[in-house]
A protein has these predicted regions:
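Compositionally biased terminal segments of proteins
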Residues: 1-151
Length: 151
């Protein structure tokens, strides 16, 4: 579950060979950042509920990197579109619930995990706080009532 968003949020990209002397390319559809965020949040949320031992700091850090790298309004605009889609709407709403639960506060599990992933190279507290701030901004920017804390 959670991959439905990639059917809506995707684009064609040209993928090139890694070797400088290899000129092969292929055009392929790849998931957009909002679809990646939805999928990653489902992975984390489902593992938290069913297999906590399989939770990986790297997955939470991937959420952090998406929140930092992609402008909030870009994510929000696409997430609004996904919420309105018959196929992707339900899983997108659930993903935003996971975002709120797991990243919505500096001491929530996802924010803590993302910070822990930065332990040897940065400041975990800054990453955890940034997760909470960015998640809050995104949830505020997305139209409509989403997630478990909406009334």
């Amino acid at each position: 579950m959670g991959l439905e968003a990639a059917i809506i949020d995707n684009e064609v990209m040209t993928i090139r060979a890694l070797a400088a002397d290899d000129d092969r390319t292929v055009d392929a559809r790849v998931a957009g950042p909002s679809a990646l965020l939805v999928a990653k949040l489902h992975k984390l949320g489902e593992r938290r509920e069913k297999a906590p031992a399989r939770l990986m700091d790297k997955d939470a850090y991937d959420v952090y990197r998406l929140l930092v790298t992609v402008p909030t309004q870009v994510l929000a605009t696409t997430l609004d579109r996904l919420l309105e889609d018959d196929l992707a709407g339900g899983v997108t709403c659930q993903a935003l619930g996971y975002l709120d639960e797991m990243f919505g506060a500096f001491d929530s599990v996802g924010a803590f995990m993302a910070g822990r992933a930065e332990e040897l190279v940065g400041d975990p507290a800054v990453v955890s706080a940034a997760c909470a701030a960015l998640a809050g901004d995104l949830l505020t920017s997305v139209a409509g009532d989403v997630g478990p804390t909406s009334e």
